[in-house]
């Protein structure tokens, strides 16, 4: 039976312009695909879900990818609990920008690790692919986080991308709590939370989940 305690998760979707951040977010929240491209400055959406039998209120911030809005990034990076680092598989430039976002998040948070998921969007456009799946997996592994390919248009792995970051926030918080109380966290080591075991983490299923729009 799902827990009735409503825990809010502040999720931030980051990435370059035109990679489909808004399309992913709207597909999650409203279950439809927005075809036209209207550059986002900043939009916030809320949705209640049950993820692994725990109630979660997702507070999703869809951010601007354009360089002219980069000054706003540190503000939302300070408040975010988990980040989806989104690039388009049809744009190598957007893939190369992901490391910049990851490094900026760690600098703002003053951490060696923080909950993130690398998302290769537009996987329905296989014929236009510029970034291989193996490259995406390797980048995520170097960050110590999960990797997933999605399609907002075809609704492939959209829910799973957001649910995976919630799962990682939960894991991170459990280890933080263990570290702060001196028990060493889930890893059993006296130290701050470590990046997840990506090899084992990939075995998690995207089931046991349902959502309500708030």
Swiss-Prot record:
GO terms for molecular function: G protein activity; GTP binding. It is an enzyme of class 3 (hydrolase). It catalyses: GTP + H2O = GDP + phosphate + H(+). Keywords: Cell membrane, GTP-binding, Hydrolase, Lipoprotein, Membrane, Methylation, Nucleotide-binding, Prenylation. The modification Cysteine methyl ester is found at residue 211. GO terms for cellular component: plasma membrane. A lipid is attached at residue 211 (S-farnesyl cysteine). Gene3D superfamilies: P-loop containing nucleotide triphosphate hydrolases. InterPro entries: P-loop_NTPase (IPR027417), Small_GTP-bd (IPR005225), Small_GTPase (IPR001806), Small_GTPase_Ras-type (IPR020849). It comes from the Eukaryota. It is a lipid-anchor. Pfam families: Ras. GTP binds at residues 15-22, 62-66, 121-124. Residues 212-214 form a propeptide. PROSITE patterns: RAS (PS51421). A motif (Effector region) lies at residues 37-45. Its EC number is 3.6.5.2. It is found in: Cell membrane. GO terms for biological process: signal transduction. Belongs to the small GTPase superfamily. Ras family. Ras proteins bind GDP/GTP and possess intrinsic GTPase activity. This is Ras-like protein.
């Amino acid at each position: 039976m799902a827990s009735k305690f409503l825990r809010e998760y502040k999720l931030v979707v980051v990435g370059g312009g035109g990679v489909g951040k808004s399309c992913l977010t709207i597909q999650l929240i409203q279950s439809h695909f927005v075809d036209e491209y209207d550059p986002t400055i900043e939009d916030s959406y809320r949705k209640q879900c049950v993820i692994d039998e725990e109630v979660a209120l997702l507070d999703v911030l869809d951010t601007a990818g354009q360089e002219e809005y980069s000054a706003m990034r540190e503000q939302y990076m300070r408040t975010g609990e988990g980040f989806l680092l989104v690039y388009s598989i049809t744009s190598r430039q957007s893939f190369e920008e992901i490391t910049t976002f990851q490094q900026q998040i760690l600098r703002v948070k003053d951490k060696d690790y923080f909950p993130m998921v690398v998302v290769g969007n537009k996987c329905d456009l296989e014929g236009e692919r510029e970034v291989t799946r193996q490259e995406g997996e390797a980048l995520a592994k170097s960050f110590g986080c999960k990797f997933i390919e999605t399609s907002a248009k075809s609704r492939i792995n959209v829910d799973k991308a957001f649910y995976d970051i919630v799962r990682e926030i939960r894991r991170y918080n459990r280890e933080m709590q263990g570290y702060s109380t001196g028990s060493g966290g889930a890893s059993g080591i006296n130290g701050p939370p470590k990046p997840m075991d990506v090899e084992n983490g990939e075995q998690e299923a995207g089931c046991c989940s349902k959502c309500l729009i708030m």
